[in-house]
């Protein structure tokens, strides 16, 4: 994910290492791999665990990688799907308000949007029904089955638009190229709302990525829309050497 997001923002390398290298970005994001995975394929240190609940990538780790790789020029703004008590924060009205705030910046190229979500809330991007003809139908979101991948995932948004019916859709850039159309994955935004709220006992949310100097203003606009800005946890270990704070 970050291997194409960061170079697209003009950050191609750090300390002589290319930011398009998956193993380097995994190191910066403090990813925890499975204990059975061959650590020899990683050129940089990564943690490992035999406990599935302690594997994967945390949202704070992603924010860490963005901040360090950009030399502090980019900042992440975390918006959790649920509030601190565990109730859904991003209900329909707040979700639409958040998209209304983010859309102009995203469409102008001033912001990136990264989702940390439960895949099984989305349309099944490998199902036979997930094809251009069916996706073009007005009832696509009701006739294409939901996914059954059974994982949490990160993916950035690549496009956002409204259909003639007014229904909002987006395109995800999935790092798994066997999904969708070589990783290009149209999805209804309402299903993404459900996906970041999550029903799998894990935390989800949205990371808004902007220039450091633009972060404070965007935080205020998001909060004025009735949406709290707060880092969430998704069960994967957060970095022990870095903590998010506004502007980082």
Describe each PLM feature range.
Residues 1-110, 200-205, 210-248:
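Cysteine-nucleophile protease catalytic domains, especially the papain-like/related folds used
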Residues 11, 15, 127-131, 184-186, ...:
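General "foldedness" signal
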Residues 72-74, 154, 160-161, 199:
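Broad hydrophobic/π-residue packing in well-ordered secondary structure
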């Amino acid at each position: 994910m970050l291997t194409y997001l960061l170079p697209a923002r003009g950050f191609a390398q750090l300390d002589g290492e290319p930011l398009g290298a998956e193993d380097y970005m995994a190191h910066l994001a403090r990813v925890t791999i499975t204990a059975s995975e061959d650590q020899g394929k990683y050129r940089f240190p990564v943690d490992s665990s035999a406990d599935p609940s302690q594997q994967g990538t945390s949202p704070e780790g992603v924010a860490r990688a963005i901040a360090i790789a950009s030399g502090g020029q980019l900042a992440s703004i975390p918006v959790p799907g649920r509030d601190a008590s565990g109730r859904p924060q991003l209900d329909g009205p707040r979700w639409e308000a958040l998209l209304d705030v983010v859309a102009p910046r995203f469409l102008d190229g001033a912001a990136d949007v990264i989702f940390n979500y439960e895949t099984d809330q989305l349309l099944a991007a490998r199902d036979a029904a997930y094809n251009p003809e069916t996706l073009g139908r007005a009832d696509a979101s009701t006739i294409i089955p939901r996914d059954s991948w059974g994982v949490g995932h990160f993916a950035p948004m690549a496009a956002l638009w409204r259909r003639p019916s007014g229904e909002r859709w987006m395109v995800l850039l999935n790092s798994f190229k066997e999904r969708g159309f070589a990783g290009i994955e149209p999805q209804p935004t309402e299903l993404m709302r459900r996906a970041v709220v999550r029903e799998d006992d894990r935390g989800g949310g949205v990371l808004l990525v902007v220039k450091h100097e633009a972060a404070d203003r965007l935080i205020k606009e998001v909060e004025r829309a009735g949406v709290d800005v707060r880092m969430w946890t998704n069960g994967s270990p957060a970095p022990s050497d870095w903590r998010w704070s506004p502007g980082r």
